[in-house]
């Protein structure tokens, strides 16, 4: 399809603009010991693999029409394709992730009034509580719909979107096919409307007030299944709904530094494997209020959700096949020890989540700011369960606490060539709820980071971290040194020591040494690592990463 579009564009529209873009990405691991593959194929059943890798090749052809004046005229065409070579992927990905072939094909035409896309399409309605189709390669998520998408802007301030198709899950890992897509046998579809009230009220524009409202409807269709449940008087068959619909309304307001958002979603009864075949309807409420001006930013948010797991297949578990993505109100830390206990959103059982943040900057040449200024950030996040199924009440019992994160961070430029950051963090982490085993972990973490510009060509950065807890694996100490050379070469080393906590959690030494080189659009990194097991999370969705040791190599190129 891409080659056909390219030939047509060159032959028929030579006076317009045609260009090609794309990228190559390779992430590999040579483990010290060959690992047993979890992917079974007729050619290699339970093979021992000494090289694991994730590989992607993206290619896009763009046609831009130079003269597109007039209503309804074509402005451009874009064709996208992606080749995936993940026959033996990195550790921690779900079994169905393994596969190879053409992972995505799409064709999009842009007009004055909107756009039409066919093939494999992504999309998001509102904050994503009903529909959020996206790709995250770190987690192994690629949940597009194979179908079509229509965006229409009939009038300024009005935008309509319709989308539908079959959702991709993973590759068909039991067949050696180059075109081995594995997607839902049934369909999902949705419509969305955004209305900018300020576009119809000139005085709002003049006062800098932006008010918008929106609504969405998403539904899925599934064929009936023969699922049985045993009761004291015999076996019974579930009466499963074939159509499941969900609706959402929202409103947002921005005015003079203030930003407010209210969003409510409701989902009809949808018995699935994830929610224990419950016929209880689902609902979610999101409230957000923020204010910002020079030197000050304040944020307060709250979210209630109950039974809001929305999948294209009622039998699906894990990371694949999810239609929605609930906003997460917990921080995503970048420091290694602070990220040991990340939170995963509880879709089926529900939760109340609260978050508040205050950021203040003292200006230059002030008593608190010093010569270069100082920034302090205070943030707190707290997640609790629901008192009972379908309840709006917060579970205030001891077991009702799911997650707590309270931290203070100080950023200061000490001198012309020295920047420093200090952070203190307290976390409460309910392992039984979040990962399915264990008890409550209460941990305190301290971080000190320094960055020194030695010369214009040499920069040194270091991190010193300490985590203390009496539960789980015990205490951690971590040190990182990183040297940037000539703005193209980075050499780093990190060492972490875990004291352990009894026979179940023995002490351990973990380390990483690596070098990364960047030239124009090329980036190559090589290293040796021994990592502890843990979770990689983004947006409240987590992937378990087992302990691993070996040589790592990554390469990326974009044009």
Task: Tell me what each language-model feature is.
Residues 17-21, 62-65, 75-79, 90-97, 107-109, 179-182, 267-280, ...:
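Outer-membrane beta-barrel proteins
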Residues 54-56, 100-105, 143-148, 189, ...:
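Short alpha-helical segments and helix-capping/turn motifs at coil-helix boundaries
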């Amino acid at each position: 399809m891409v080659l056909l579009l390219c030939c047509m564009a060159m032959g028929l529209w030579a006076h317009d603009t045609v260009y090609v873009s794309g990228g190559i990405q390779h992430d590999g691991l040579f483990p010290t010991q060959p690992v047993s593959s979890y992917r079974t194929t007729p050619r290699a059943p339970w093979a021992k693999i000494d090289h694991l890798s994730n590989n992607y090749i993206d290619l896009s052809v763009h046609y831009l029409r130079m003269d597109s004046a007039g209503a309804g005229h074509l402005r451009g065409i874009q064709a996208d394709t992606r080749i995936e070579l993940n026959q033996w992927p990195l550790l921690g990905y779900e079994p169905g992730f393994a596969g190879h072939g053409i992972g995505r094909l799409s064709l999009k035409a842009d007009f004055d009034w909107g756009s039409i896309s066919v093939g494999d399409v992504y999309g998001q309605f509102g904050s994503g509580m009903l529909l959020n189709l996206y790709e995250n390669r770190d987690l192994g998520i690629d949940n597009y719909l194979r179908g079509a998408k229509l965006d229409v802007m009939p009038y300024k301030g009005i935008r309509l979107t319709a989308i539908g198709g079959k959702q991709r899950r993973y590759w068909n890992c039991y067949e050696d096919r180059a075109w081995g897509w594995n997607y839902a046998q049934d369909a999902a579809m949705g419509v969305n409307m955004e209305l900018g009230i300020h576009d119809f009220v000139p005085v709002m524009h003049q006062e800098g007030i932006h008010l918008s409202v929106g609504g969405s409807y998403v539904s899925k269709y599934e064929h009936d299944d023969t699922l049985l449940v045993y009761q004291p008087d015999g076996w019974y068959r579930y009466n499963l709904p074939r159509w499941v619909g969900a609706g959402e309304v929202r409103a947002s307001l921005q005015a003079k530094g203030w930003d407010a958002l209210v969003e409510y979603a409701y989902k009809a009864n949808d018995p699935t494997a994830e929610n224990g075949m419950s016929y209880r309807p689902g609902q979610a409420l999101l409230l957000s209020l923020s204010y910002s001006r020079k030197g000050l930013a304040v944020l307060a948010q709250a979210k209630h959700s109950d039974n809001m797991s929305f999948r294209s297949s009622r039998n699906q578990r894990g990371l694949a096949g999810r239609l929605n993505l609930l906003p997460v109100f917990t921080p995503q830390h970048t420091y290694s020890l602070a990220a040991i206990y990340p939170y995963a959103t509880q879709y089926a059982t529900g939760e109340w989540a609260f978050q508040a943040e205050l950021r203040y900057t003292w200006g230059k040449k002030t008593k608190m700011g010093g010569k270069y200024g100082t920034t302090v950030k205070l943030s707190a996040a707290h997640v609790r369960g629901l008192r009972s199924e379908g309840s709006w009440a917060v579970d205030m019992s001891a077991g009702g606490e799911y997650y707590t994160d309270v931290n203070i961070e100080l950023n200061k430029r000490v001198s012309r060539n020295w920047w420093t950051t200090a952070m203190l963090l307290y976390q409460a982490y309910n392992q039984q709820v979040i990962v399915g085993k264990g008890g409550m972990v209460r941990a305190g973490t301290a971080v000190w980071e320094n960055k020194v510009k030695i010369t214009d060509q040499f920069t040194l950065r270091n991190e010193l971290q300490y985590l203390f807890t009496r539960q789980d694996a015990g205490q951690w100490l971590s040190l990182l040194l990183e040297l940037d050379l000539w703005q193209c070469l980075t050499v780093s080393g990190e060492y972490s020591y875990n004291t352990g906590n009894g026979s179940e959690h023995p002490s351990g030494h973990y380390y990483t040494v690596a070098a990364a080189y960047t030239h124009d659009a090329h980036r190559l990194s090589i290293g040796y690592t021994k990592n502890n097991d843990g979770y990689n999370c983004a947006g409240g969705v987590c992937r378990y990463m087992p302990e691993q040791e070996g040589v790592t190599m990554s390469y990326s190129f974009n044009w």
